[in-house]
Amino acid sequence: MAKKTGKGRGRKNGERPVKAAPQDAGIHVFGRARPSQAGAYPIHGEPERDTKFRPLPSPTGAPPFHLDLRSVISPSDYQALVTAKKLTFHVNGDMGGIKNGMDQQLVARGMEADFKPKAPLSDNPAFLYILGDCVYYNGEVKEYYSQFYEPYEFFPRPIFAVPGNHDGESLPGEEPLEGFLRNFCAKSPLKMPEAQDSNRTAMTQPNVYWTLLTPLANFVGLYSNVPAGGEITAPQSEWLGKELKSLSKDVPLIVTLHHPIYSADDHHSGSTRMKKVLESVAEKVGRHPDMLLAGHVHNYQRITKHVKDGTQVPYIVVGAGGYYNLHHMMKVDGENMIPPVTFKDKEGDPVTLDRFSADHHGFMRMEITGKLIVGRYYTVPRQHEPYTKGNQLLDYFEFDWRAKRYIPNTLPTPVPSAVLTAHVRGRKAKKL
C-alpha cells in the first residue's frame, strides 16, 4: 500500500491519478468558507521547452461546444442574475504559482475579499474566468492541487478557463492538455483525485475551445495552442466563424484567448498571427467581437483599437494572476510610458494603451448590464508590502457595448451653493 506523503496524497512517487473519486452525479461543487490560511507551495525548476504546435484533443462534449451557465449554478442563482439584469465576474490569467506560490495566494485572497457579505448575487462575482496558463510549466496533473485546487479552495463560485501555452506544452509520455481536460473538460462534475482535500469538482466545459452562455453576455473561448504568438487552424477557425455569425446580438460577444493580439510589453509583445485569424474570420462573417480578453503577458494592459467608423474595441491583457515573474513594459526614449500612448504593431496598425500595471499582481472585476461593460482592475500587495494594504483600484472604465464606445470618466457636476439645502434635526431648511 502506498505510503501517504501529505494530506490527501496517498500514491507512489511519480504515479499519476487516472480515476475520479466518488461524487454525487451531476452536482457541481465549488469553494467553501475559509477556516484558516492555506498551506505552502513547493519550489520547482523550469524544464526545457518544446513549443511546437500540439494537435487538439477530442472534444468531451457535442458541437457547437456550448456550456450554459444555468447548468452549472443553481436555478435560483441563475434567476437572480436574470431578474437583476446584471452579471458580475472575475477575470485573470497566468495564475499558476510555481516557484513561489505566495503571489498567487495573495491574488486569490484579493479575489476572495472582493465578495461582499450579504450582497445580492448580481453584485458579487458569479464566476472566475481564467485566460490560460492555469498550471506551470507543462500542465501536469500532479501540479493541479498546489497550483489550482489549493489556492482557490475558498473561491466560492465556479471557475472556467481557456488553455494557455503552458497548459498544452506537455512533457514526453503525457498527452497534450491532459490535466486541463481532466479538470476543466470533464463529462460530469466529479471530484478528481488531484483535488485531494479541496471541495471543488471538475468543470464540464465541452471542449478546449468553447462558448460560455450567460443571460448577459456570451464568451467565445479559443485555444491559441503552444507556439510563440499562438496558432489557430481549422476546424477551430471555422467554428469561430459560426459562433460569431450565430450567437445572439442582444448581449455582448466577448472573445477570450491566451495569446494577446496587442501588447506593449518588452517580453512577449502582441501576435499579428492571432490578429490575422480573428480579423479574417470576423470580416468573412460580418461581425466583430465587442471586446477581447487575453493573458500570456504577465501584467495588466487596457488597449483600445479605434476603428475608422468611429467605434472602439477594447483589447485587455489580464496576465498578472499569480505567476511569480511579472513582465516589464516597453520604454520610450529610455523612460517609462505615461498613458495614453499610441503605438503600432508590426503591420503598422495603431492602437492606444490607455492604462497598465507592470509592478503588481492583480485581478479584474467586470460587470455587464443591458448597455454597459464596467471594468475595475485591482492590484494586490506584493510580498514585501503590508497585507493590510488590501486591494487597490488601478483602472476603471465604462464601455457602451451597443454604441461600441467608452463613456468618459467624469466626476458629478457640483451643485451650486445657491440651491444647496440643509437638514437640521430631520427637517428640511430653506435654500441657502
Task: Give names to the regions the model predicted.
Residues 29-77, 142-252, 267-291, 299-357, ...:
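Extended active-site neighborhood of metal-dependent phosphoesterases/phosphodiesterases
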Residues 94, 132-133, 164-165, 222, ...:
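Active-site glycine-centered loops adjacent to acidic/histidine catalytic or metal-binding residues
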Residues 97, 135-136, 261, 299:
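Short active-site segment of divalent metal-dependent hydrolases/proteases
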Residues 257-259, 296, 317-319, 377-379:
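Active-site proximal loops enriched in glycine and acidic residues that flank catalytic Cys/His/Asp
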Residues 89-91, 129-130, 219-221, 254-256, ...:
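Structural motif
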